[in-house]
A protein has these predicted regions:
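Short cysteine clusters
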Residues: 26-29
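Alpha-helix C-terminal capping segments
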Residues: 9-14, 33-42, 92
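Thiol-based oxidoreductase modules, predominantly thioredoxin-like and allied folds used
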Residues: 2-4, 21, 33-55, 61
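N-terminal "domain-start" segment that seeds a small globular fold
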Residues: 1-11
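Non-catalytic, surface beta->alpha helical segment in thiol-disulfide oxidoreductase systems
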Residues: 69-96
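Short active-site neighborhood of thiol/selenol oxidoreductases, capturing the structured segment around
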Residues: 13-23
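Structural micro-motif
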Residues: 59-68
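Short amphipathic alpha-helix with an adjacent loop that forms part of the alpha/beta core around
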Residues: 11, 58-59
Length: 96
């Protein structure tokens, strides 16, 4: 899972993808990481919420982990907290 900054984020979301906003100190974020690694249907990126505070404000991130799926540059679905693989795959139901 590639860690991206705010600049890379802007170009990454132009393709269908999943972005996880998380931190290094967050227990649920650490638990979620291996599950995110199993998603192969679309690119999965990680944004460090501590380093990219302005991006978190822009996207209304109030809790980590927050996982957002993007389709054609727009937010499609959002989940907060540790998730199962099946819940993550439900975020991708836009016909990939």
């Amino acid at each position: 899972m590639k860690i991206i900054n705010a600049e890379e984020f802007k170009s990454a979301i132009n393709e269908d993808c999943v972005v996880a906003f998380s931190t290094s100190w967050c227990g649920p974020c650490k638990m979620l990481a291996p599950t995110l690694e199993t998603i192969t249907e679309v690119p999965v990126y990680k944004v460090d919420a501590d380093s990219e505070a302005q991006l978190c404000i822009e996207y209304g991130i109030r809790s980590v982990p927050t996982i957002i799926s993007f389709k054609e540059g727009k937010e499609y679905k959002r989940l907060v907290g540790n998730q199962t693989k099946s819940k993550l795959l439900e975020m991708l139901d836009y016909g990939l």
